[in-house]
């Protein structure tokens, strides 16, 4: 009799446990491209931005299947030859085109063609311009990541958390129903 009870409980709770496993927290993948004449200057910017993005905890810096693309055009300004006067960073925020809806509307035999022809399309989302002294380069880079996080990542993170919370409420109510039926 106990074995039957355990089997019934397993059958009842297994789908709920499986549902709970799909509740992954928010994470995103960001590609970073920096364009600058000076390799040392470019390297510093890549290092500062990458480090700051990774410190967010839910961001992976990668070129493979990014959710976001940050393109930074960096310039150094000089006074009379070699003396650095300032830095200018133009940041463009891009998002790869989400072709899922389009592919759902296309005839099956054309899906591969449509998928290939839309790969690599990026949607322009935002642009910022930061200007400062060379000694403030790190704080300028931190500001870029803070702006990117607050304007683009944070809303997605909050949306994902709301989805998780509502799924947990649904699982909780299903469990309560099952427990009440047992009583």
Language model features with spans:
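A mature extracytoplasmic/lumenal domain signature
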Residues: 36, 49, 65, 74-76, ...
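C-terminal/domain-edge helix-coil "capping" segments
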Residues: 101-183
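A structural "domain/chain start" motif
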Residues: 16-56, 156-183
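Extracytoplasmic
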Residues: 25-29, 65-70
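N-terminal amphipathic/basic membrane-interacting segments and domains
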Residues: 61, 66-67, 144
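Sec-dependent N-terminal signal peptides
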Residues: 3-20
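Structured segments of extracytoplasmic/periplasmic soluble domains
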Residues: 52-59, 147, 151
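Surface-exposed short loop/turn segments
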Residues: 56-60, 69-135
